[in-house]
Regions:
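Extracytoplasmic cell-surface/polysaccharide-interacting catalytic and binding patches
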Residues: 4-32, 36-312
Length: 312
């Protein structure tokens, strides 16, 4: 070390200054390297002996952050996306309201209601179903193509006084629509609205209100006789079904292949949505920072619809 200092003090003043500058630079570099090495070693030890290191799923993280919860048992039997048939009976507990009592039921310019309810006053539907239907009927009546038509007739819905009805109508999600062909002559004649030009607007726009034509005549299950049955599923689901020209059952099959990190993504009149499926034995993953809705599928699984544009 003594020799080092002697070397630094030898030579002219200018030579000594240059030697000292080089020496200081070497010392500073060595100290910096030692500090960096220490930080690296400490970080490695923390990680090795219990330090937490989160590894978010990149695909999932690019869409929405998630967390987990435990769904209530009744949620698997409720919602707008239940499979309903003879093998999958309705077991839900959704509130059914009388259609006649809906406060937002639209009226014509002259005062009467835009549509008529079937022969019994006890036809009902879920709040979401009838609210969406009322908005659709108000817009239909106001559209130039309707000619201010007020002959629509809800021929069939959930009959709250009858136990002998199909699973579809018992759910309060389905409405069968007919119309008065000769309202002032014979009110008993009520054909299906299917195939009638002035009601084409309803078929073209129902998805914007959350409805699907339950049995399109073009599908395997379709028939002209049932082509006037509309089911409420919600705007994003109705939009996807309409755009992809598939049946409700085919949509449920498509959903079964989705996950929180690989959802269906769709842009609707109601905003951007992510939709994914959780199987019966799957972890209950939900968005952490976005609002969402849950529907059972009546097979034990759950369908989560995330509002991509709405944060909590």
């Amino acid at each position: 070390m003594k020799n080092v200092f002697l070397a630094l003090e030898s030579g002219s003043m200018e030579q000594q200054r240059k030697k000292k500058s080089v020496a200081y630079a070497i010392i500073i570099t060595a100290v910096a390297l030692m500090i960096s090495l220490s930080v690296f070693l400490i970080s490695g030890l923390v990680s090795l002996f219990g330090g937490k290191s989160e590894k978010p799923n990149k695909d999932n993280n690019s869409l929405f952050e998630t967390t987990t919860t435990v769904f209530e048992g009744s949620q698997k039997d409720n919602g707008s996306l239940l499979l309903l048939d003879d093998n999958h009976p309705y077991r839900g507990t959704s509130e059914i309201i009388l259609i006649r009592d809906a406060k937002d039921r639209p009226k014509t310019d002259g005062g009467p209601y835009v549509y008529t309810i079937g022969g019994t006053p006890y036809l009902g539907a879920t709040t979401e179903t009838i609210s969406a239907f009322n908005q659709m009927m108000a817009d239909f009546y106001a559209h130039p193509s309707s000619g201010k038509d007020d002959n629509i007739y809800i021929d069939k819905a959930c009959n709250i006084t009858s136990a002998s009805q199909s699973e579809l109508f018992a759910s309060g999600l389905c409405l069968a629509l007919t119309y008065y062909e000769n309202y002032n002559v014979d009110s008993s004649i009520r054909p299906s609205i299917y195939g009638v030009e002035k009601y084409k607007w309803i078929y073209d726009n129902a998805h914007k209100y959350g409805f699907i034509q339950l049995y399109p005549a073009t599908t395997e299950d379709g028939s002209t006789a049932d082509a006037n049955i509309f089911r409420y599923v919600g705007i994003p689901h109705a939009t996807y079904i309409k755009q992809n020209k598939i049946s409700f059952e085919e949509y449920l099959t498509a959903l079964s292949a989705t996950t929180p990190s690989n959802p269906i993504s769709i842009n609707t009149v109601d905003g951007n949505k992510y939709i994914y499926y959780i199987p019966a034995d799957g972890e209950h993953v939900i968005p952490k920072n976005n609002t969402y809705s849950i529907s059972g599928d009546n097979k034990g699984g759950y369908i989560i619809t995330v509002n991509a544009d709405v944060s909590i």
